[in-house]
Amino acid sequence: VENTLLGLGCERSDFTRPTSEFSGGWRMRIELAKLLLKSPDVLLLDEPTNHLDIESIGWLEDFICNSSKAVVVISHDRKFVDDITTRTIEVTMGRIYDYKATYSQYLELRKERREQQMKQYEEQQKMIADTKEFIERFKGTYSKTLQVQSRVKMLEKLQLIEVDEEDTSRLRLKFPPSPRSGAYPVQMSEVAMSFDGKNVFSGVNLTVERGDKIAFVGRNGEGKSTLVKCIMGQLQNEGKLELGHNVQIGYFAQNQASLLDGELTVFQTIDDVAKGDVRNKIRDLLGAFMFGGEESTKKVKVLSGGERTRLAILKLLLEPVNLLILDEPTNHLDLKTKDVLKQALLDFDGTLIVVSHDRDFLDGLVSKVYEFGHGRVREHWCGIYEFRESKKMESRQ
């Protein structure tokens, strides 16, 4: 029991606390621990990593891989599903496809399947066009009556070949031009924060340079979102925290979705902020963020929380800013949409700060990691996997 709770991020001091004292995210961890300890024959997990930090996700992966039980998981965490699964089931367009493959292998197999579908679809469409032409040409010819009737019946009974939805992950989202910020968008000197006398972090001395792409990582409750709110001026910190010259911030947090105008449609929301060449790709962008077809005509007020989150992120990406701060942006995104977002952020020439536990999303995106823990913030000049390896080496020493 202790190993499971510690693995999922609890402290020993938490063991005797009433569950009513914990936040919703921590209660989800407690429920997950209870489920794992029951040792069921089949484990059904729906987005189990959403409320976990990077360390806890790694522990859960090891737990599942070392278990002999069957596991069925729904997840948008590519690294997680690649590490724990050997079979991928795709549900698309009213059909189910079963692949004896990891997610990465499935992507290649799906691509081959779609190419085959497209070839069969094009052949069928040519056959349909030829048949309709024959019917039109000979429908008044007595000697061809039986052949015409036969072809009409054939078309009526024909089962049309459907082609899987196109992969939108290659879609490139171009940021609007924004004014250049100063060389140091954010500077911190002896920054500290506490709540009700309890220290969250102290002695933070960090300089964010223009063009940096930085990940904030650490266990939940260690102050990642708190420092973001200090940068945004939403919380008053101790010490000195300064924004650089001409810094224009674009900020996303889960509550940003509630600030959208509920009376506008999805399309109008994006149309209002889209400028330049991107205006010609609004529908493609909406499709990439899962608002294709009639979904784009829905009013914002009828969207679910996850749908509003997706729309808020897309809207933010189209606004001219030079410092992007994203707090858990991938929680409501599917894998393809995450790819579109990641590519957009790679192309972004401003400064990026992202709070995330999604290792695949952070891999190749960030070149600095700020680690939050034990009341401190440590700076690591490396990507997320180099950081993870350094932490493993520390734990062995």
What are these regions (language model features)?
Residues 117-139, 144-153, 169, 389-397:
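ABC ATPase nucleotide-binding domains
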Residues 132, 156-159, 366:
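Short, amphipathic alpha-helical segments that act as regulatory/interfacial helices
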Residues 1-121, 170, 174-397:
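ABC ATP-binding cassette signature C-motif
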Residues 157-167:
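Amphipathic alpha-helical coiled-coil segments
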Residues 1, 150-159:
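Short amphipathic alpha-helical coiled-coil/interface segments
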